[in-house]
């Protein structure tokens, strides 16, 4: 990480230069503790330059940011419904159509022959509806949360001398604010 707790892309580049064979780089799209956002396109470019597979955990970002998997050069993307008011226990994985995987567990033909077991139909439908609603009201929701967050920042700064904000709070996830209080 660099001084502002962003992923150090130079270090990632250096690490990948020393790897032989297939490798998977997996990084959070948005950090849940300090709110930093990953420069996904830059990471994807670095990974492509080293023939590395790139997975991003988008749990904190899905439903709060528009993510176009056709434009972003991700190989894998995962998310979870509970972060945008979907059912707990329902999640998803996007796998780029150019990727060929073998099932980890043999069995039934669920999920295009990739997994065995009964599908959680209610969870899947609920997750689909939750993501639909999240994006339908994304702009209004974001404006409301940003207004509350900015008010909180302003009040903390005016009421508590020496208060600090961790991470890249001005350019980070608008739903997260990590605060340091003076001793």
Regions found by a protein language model. Give the residues of each.
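Pyridoxal 5′-phosphate
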Residues: 1-183
């Amino acid at each position: 990480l660099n001084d502002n707790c962003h992923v150090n892309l130079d270090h990632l580049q250096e690490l990948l230069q020393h790897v032989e064979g297939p490798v998977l780089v997996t990084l959070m799209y948005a950090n849940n503790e300090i709110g930093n956002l990953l420069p996904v396109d830059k990471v994807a470019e670095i990974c492509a330059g080293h023939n590395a597979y790139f997975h991003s955990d988008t749990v904190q970002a899905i439903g709060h940011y528009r993510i176009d998997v056709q434009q972003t050069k991700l190989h894998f993307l995962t998310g979870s419904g509970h972060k945008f008011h979907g059912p707990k226990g329902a999640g998803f994985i996007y796998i780029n159509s150019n990727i060929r995987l073998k099932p980890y567990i043999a069995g039934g033909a669920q999920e295009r022959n990739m997994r065995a077991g009964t599908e959680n139909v209610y969870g899947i439908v609920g997750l689909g509806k939750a993501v639909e609603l999240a994006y339908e009201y994304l702009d209004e929701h974001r404006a409301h949360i940003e207004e509350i967050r900015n008010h909180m920042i302003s009040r903390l700064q005016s009421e508590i001398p020496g208060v600090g904000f961790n991470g890249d709070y001005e350019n980070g996830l608008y739903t997260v604010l990590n605060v340091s209080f003076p001793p």
